[in-house]
Amino acid sequence: MKKELSNEELNDDIRLSIRTLENLFNQSYNYFAFKYTDIYTGFTISYNEKQEIFTASTIKAPMAIYLYEQAKKGLVNLDEKLTYTSAYYNTGTGVLKNREFNQDYTVRELISYAIIPSDNAAHNMLMDRYGRANMYNFWTEKGTTSIFRNYSNWGVVNANDATIYMKELYDYYNTDTELSNELMKNFTSVTFKPLSGKNNSKNTANKSGWSGTAFHDAAIVFDDNPYILVVLSNVGYSDYTYLFNLTSKVVSELHEKYWNLKYNKCQEIITG
C-alpha cells in the first residue's frame, strides 16, 4: 500500500523517536535542520526544513543531476572537453589542484571529480560552461526555492531543496539507463559518508559539504525500503560525528518502526 500512515495511526514508540530527534536538534543552534523522507510512501519528519544555509559542496549534487538529465535529452555532451587553466586553481578539495594547467577533461570526468573527491575546480568549470540560471530554472520547476538562486557558483540550500534533488536522483536512477546508472555510481562511490543507515551501514548515495562551520550531508539510504536523510549544520568538521551519528541511528530506528507498523496495518486490512 503506497500510502503513508496518518499522525493518528503512529504508535507511541514512533512518537518517542520523533521527540528524540526534535530534542536533539533543539540542543544547539548549530544543529540547523534535518529532513527524513520515506521514498515509497512520502512519510516525512523534518526540523527547520525551509531555513537557508550556505551550501558548501552539497551544491555539486544538483549540478551533476541537472547535467545528466540534460545529457539524456541530448542537450549536454558528456564527452565535450573543457580546459583546466590557472584561472580555476583552487586550494580546496579535489584532484585538479595537483594537475598541470591547460589539460583537457571531458564533462563526464569533471562531474565525477566534482562528486567523488568533491573537486572545487571541476565544479567551477562546469558552472561556468553551463550556467547557474539554467540550473535555477530547471530546479525551481521541480519545487526548489533556494539552490542556484544567488548569483554565485555556490549559494544557499535548505533541507527541503536537498530532499527534492536527492529524490530526483533516485527517480532518475530508476529509469535504469546507462546514463542514470553512471550518475548513481558517482554518488555511491563517494567515500566520505557522514550519514549512515541501520547498524551504521554506509550503503548510501550521498553528497556532503563542508566549509568553515557549515557541515552538511544529503543521502539516499538504501534500506529494504529506501529513504532520504538530510542534515544541515554549523558544527564544522571537528565536531560533526555526534550529531550525524545520532541522527542516523535514531532515524534508522524510526524508519524500521514505521515500516513494521505499516506492515501490521496492511496485514490487518488483508485478514479483515
Predicted regions mapped to residue ranges:
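Active-site SXXK
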Residues: 42, 53-84, 114, 229
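Short, conserved catalytic-motif segment at the N-terminal edge
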Residues: 30-52
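Active-site-proximal beta-strand/loop segments in catalytic clefts of secreted hydrolases
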Residues: 37-39, 87, 115-118, 126-129, ...
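Active-site-adjacent helix/loop patches that line small-molecule binding or acyl-intermediate pockets
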Residues: 5-17, 99-182, 186
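Short glycine/serine- and small hydrophobic-enriched flexible loop segments
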Residues: 65-73, 116, 164-171, 252-256
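Active-site-proximal loop and beta-strand segments within enzyme catalytic domains
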Residues: 71-108, 124
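Structured C-terminal helix/loop/strand segments within mature extracytoplasmic catalytic/sensor domains
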Residues: 1-28, 44, 52, 170-191, ...
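Structural recognition of the beta-strand scaffold that forms the well-ordered cores
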Residues: 33-36, 56, 113, 122, ...
